[in-house]
Regions:
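A Rossmann-like FAD-binding core segment of flavoenzymes
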Residues: 1-36, 62-70, 97-173
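Glycine-rich dinucleotide-binding loop and its adjacent helix/turn
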Residues: 2-5, 35-98
Length: 173
């Protein structure tokens, strides 16, 4: 059988060696506790959400667990998710499942260079997510009330590889 030990701090509540001695296999689901910011103008505007709080609030709602943060609901909204990794795929698919009216995933490179799982991208497309490639976000556009109204982007083309060997997206006119 499988035993789940949630909210357990390895090294404090249980020692790693104890787990290794007691079980044939150990999965540590440490999660992502630090979310990244893009440094875009107006990224703190109302209507802009960070991936991690969005996904966490959805998980608590689906599992009917109490949570001290508000539920972030995309029902009926037009959603743009910036990025091409698995977290972005989680966000677009969650938005679709919440009933968003339109979901777009904008990524700065082409589809072949997305870091996310091919299966996740395929599933997102099947669920109705639209993809826009070679678009680098420059900033968040806001209305007269300071609420998000769009995303300013520039078209890109792949240039020379970066230090990690991935071709850099470079703005094109």
């Amino acid at each position: 059988g499988v035993e789940f030990r949630m909210n357990v701090e390895v090294g404090q509540d249980v020692q790693m060696q104890e787990l290794l001695d007691e079980y044939d296999a150990v999965f540590l689901g440490v999660g992502t506790y630090k979310y990244m910011r893009a440094g875009l103008e107006n990224e703190d505007a109302p209507g802009v959400y960070d991936a991690l709080p969005f996904l966490i609030s959805n998980t608590y709602k689906v599992m009917e667990l109490e949570h001290n943060q508000p539920f972030i609901d995309m029902a009926g909204k037009k959603v743009v998710v910036l990025g091409g990794g698995d977290t972005a795929m989680d966000c677009v698919r969650t938005s679709i499942r919440q009933g968003a009216s339109n979901v777009i995933c904008a990524y700065r490179r082409d589809e072949e260079n997305m870091p996310g799982s091919r299966r996740e991208v395929k599933n997102a497309k099947e669920e109705g997510v639209k993809f826009m490639f070679n678009l680098q976000p420059l900033g968040i556009e806001v209305d007269a009330y300071g609420k998000v109204s769009g995303v300013k982007v520039v078209k890109t083309a792949l240039g020379e590889p970066d230090d990690a060997g991935r071709r850099r997206p470079e703005p094109v006119e």
